[in-house]
Amino acid sequence: KWGVFIMLMGEFHHNLDEKGRLIIPSKFRNELGEKYVITKGLDKCLFVYSLSNFEKIVNKLSTLQFTRKNVRAFERSFIGSASLNEFDKQGRINITSPLVHYANITKECVIIGALERLEIWSLEDYNKYMKENEEDLASIAEDIFNMNYEA
């Protein structure tokens, strides 16, 4: 942990077993803590949050007007698919069938740290996404770091 801020970074490849379990590297487990929340992410991957970081998102969502169509749609997908879990003794997480289907996971997975969350991708979708976006990374970085960012 970096102060009060969780710092998840790195890329790992593991296989989903026949019971829907996936080994999460110990460096990620140590940052997330005993309990985690897994849910549908964006771009057809899964997001994994520490309980405290998920609570921050829920608190933010609770301030939004549920009468807005986009708010309801996001809550249904993001909150509706979320589940609170604990790592098993082997450091694995359980991924439910609906989440496996959503993320197109068959067996091979890529687990990446993305600051305050993990992303779990099917290997095929991750490679496709990275290939499609690699040429845009320079302009994306320029846009991000020109948004009132001071190092």
Q: Could you tell me what each predicted segment is?
A:
Residues 1-14, 18-19, 27-85, 89, ...:
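Flexible "stalk/tail and boundary" regions
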